[in-house]
Design a protein with these regions (language model features):
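Interaction-mediating elements
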Residues: 20-308
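C-terminal motif of bacterial Sec signal peptides marking the signal peptidase cleavage site
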Residues: 15-18
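Bacterial N-terminal signal peptides that target proteins for export
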Residues: 1-7
Length: 308
């Protein structure tokens, strides 16, 4: 019995392979049969680069067979027939080569490497159409020597913000609350000799922004932080400085002045014991009595319990 099932399965696979995968590829068109990435460097895996390709071949089950494409090709040309509709719904239409998307993929890959510090990266693409109605696209990448950070410094004009940005991780016990700031928040992501990676630079801005917002700078955002990169040494190294943009305050007369960023403090704290977000009745939210203790106002309504 198992032998018969195996034979049926082999016949089924042979039937799939024998089916034309270019049935719905028109004249002058090419099925995108395969995409290859060839790189001189070993820094990034092909799997890391594929998301930047604007066009991918049809899906391969277990990396062996484009069964969804074969199912689609089983359908007839009469789109109104129920069986053809079902086959096309279960299958996948052939991916037709689009040279515009190939060009865009080259640009995306080059932008990726530039953002990672490979400022002189070379990316090109070649298209092989020697097989009938099928195309193989090969992307060739030459990363060349990357730029690295030589010296990194912070030049934040506000002394309070500068001190917060340079905070060291506090010593906490193992039982410290999980909701408190983790030590990673205090560790700079930018290191000397590291790649001039723009994604890391952006994460560093966000790290400092998080530190500031947790300390009362609620109106602060990462756009107030910028960098100046000096590569004049011309040795694939960069001197990097972080700068702080001032807060621009508009006066009543319409003039704009640069000022320090504002740090907010908690003034009043009120606790409403009877508050129910599911109840819209205003009377239930109206306080019947107020108790002040340790600088906190406790308001409770007619259903609340006195805590005097």
């Amino acid at each position: 019995m198992k032998g018969i099932q195996t034979l049926y399965f082999i016949c089924f696979l042979l039937l799939l392979v024998s089916c034309s995968s270019t049935k719905y590829v028109g004249e002058g068109e090419y099925l995108l049969d395969k995409v290859e990435i060839v790189s001189d460097g070993k820094t990034y895996k092909n799997s890391d680069l594929k998301p930047y390709l604007r066009q991918q071949p049809n899906f391969k089950a277990f990396g062996l067979m484009k069964w969804q494409l074969f199912v689609y090709d089983w359908s007839g040309r009469n789109e109104k027939k129920w069986i053809n509709k079902q086959l096309r719904r279960m299958g996948e239409a052939p991916v037709i080569l689009d040279t515009t998307l190939v060009t865009q993929s080259v640009d995306e890959l080059k932008r990726f490497f530039i953002n990672k510090g490979y400022m002189n990266a070379e990316v090109s693409a070649s298209i092989d159409t020697s097989r009938v109605k099928k195309a193989v696209v090969t992307y060739r990448i030459v990363p060349n020597t990357p730029y690295r950070i030589h010296n990194y410094s912070m030049d934040l004009s506000d002394p309070k913000i500068d001190s917060i940005a340079k905070l060291k991780p506090p010593h906490r016990s193992v039982l410290a609350s999980a909701f408190r700031t983790y030590s990673d928040d205090y560790t700079s992501l930018i290191k000397d000799s590291a790649l001039f990676d723009r994604d890391v630079l952006d994460k560093e801005r966000q790290r400092i922004t998080t530190l500031l917002r947790r300390r009362g700078y609620y109106a602060f955002n990462r756009d107030y932080l910028s960098y100046i990169a000096d590569s004049s040494l011309n040795r694939n190294i960069v001197d990097l400085d972080m700068l702080l943009k001032p807060y621009r305050l508009q006066k009543p007369d319409g003039t704009v002045v640069d000022t320090l960023h504002r740090q907010y403090y908690i003034k009043d704290v009120s606790i409403v014991t009877d508050y129910d977000p599911l109840t819209l009745e205003e009377n239930n939210a109206m306080p019947y009595d107020t108790v002040r203790t340790d600088g906190i106002d406790i308001l409770y309504g007619k259903n609340g319990r006195s805590i005097r």
